Amino acid sequence: MKILVDENMPYARDLFSRLGEVTAVPGRPIPVAQLADADALMVRSVTKVNESLLAGKPIKFVGTATAGTDHVDEAWLKQAGIGFSAAPGCNAIAVVEYVFSSLLMLAERDGFSLHDRTVGIVGVGNVGRRLQARLEALGIKTLLCDPPRADRGDEGDFRSLDELVQHADILTFHTPLFKDGPYKTLHLADEKLIRSLKPGAILINACRGAVVDNTALLTCLNEGQKLSVVLDVWEGEPELNVELLTKVDIGTPHIAGYTLEGKARGTTQVFEAYSKFIGHEQHVALDTLLPAPEFGRITLHGPLDQPTLKRLVHLVYDVRRDDAPLRKVAGIPGEFDKLRKNYLERREWSSLYVICDDASAASLLCKLGFNAVHHPAR
């Protein structure tokens, strides 16, 4: 049994070698010749999986180690009788922590408290729900917009997008990319929406590049609209609008979900799905794969305020470490993908062990996802 895996999927060689012969290949582009005798293909979002790639090939199963699936023609795979699995929620925590890192940086730079801001969350799936929970743990007001969930009658106080635009100080997008249909998200943030944002609003896109109309956004910024922008995803990746990059406050190369834990979850989820598909079901404990974190433990004295939270968050991950490298190489062919391929190890907040002498601080940090304990001061 021959299994092709994206060379940038961590732990893929070791895990899938339990099931067959593993060959690691680049994801963009996939070497088509390798597909001629392969039984399974494991990809990331950079690989377009469709009829033109797989027609006439012996592939029986495709797995994507990503939450999003807009790069995969699922309908064709089903028609062709090819098994498929994604990894929903694998990087949700990572994306939430990316958003927090960005917001805390902007809050420090611009001198505001997040408690004085209302956050509008567009898309309330794995990422949006977790983001809402952490913001509300901090006492920060949120507004939710998710028409598909609202129409299904899912639990939640869902509002219209117009209402979020009117009332939110921060608007953050966490939707799939739907190019048509009743829940179309292509250019959901169009020129009209962008112009309607509150003065000084923060716009964040960490889902799919085309959810925000990049040309319209650049037009508004060039005209002097007072707006802070955080973009992790771009229309036309791996190409991007270099002029737009110069105008945004934070720009990164589609790495919001790139924690070691998130990547490992993606790999293990598709590994478990494929092992079940071939009748050799196996389960993997994530902590058996991950290395020890860089920081062993730290001690926190007193209550948790925003500056202290910012220091803790940026100790684990400061988004500026990914903004600067992109600006240096933007527009150079191949460099966007190189930044992703050679991405520095990044951990999640749970890797940081925090000893607190304040019980409320320990409790709050645990709700936020840190590994925190309360030890009273002596």
Swiss-Prot record:
Pathway(s) served: Cofactor biosynthesis; pyridoxine 5'-phosphate biosynthesis; pyridoxine 5'-phosphate from D-erythrose 4-phosphate: step 2/5
Reactions catalysed according to its record: 4-phospho-D-erythronate + NAD(+) = (R)-3-hydroxy-2-oxo-4-phosphooxybutanoate + NADH + H(+)
Gene Ontology cellular-component terms listed: cytosol
Active site (record annotation): 208, 237, 254 (proton donor)
PANTHER family named among the record's database cross-references: FORMATE DEHYDROGENASE 1 (PTHR42938:SF9)
Assembly, per entry: Homodimer.
Family, as annotated: Belongs to the D-isomer specific 2-hydroxyacid dehydrogenase family. PdxB subfamily.
Name of this protein: Erythronate-4-phosphate dehydrogenase
Source species of the chain: Shigella boydii serotype 18 (strain CDC 3083-94 / BS512)
Name of encoding gene: pdxB
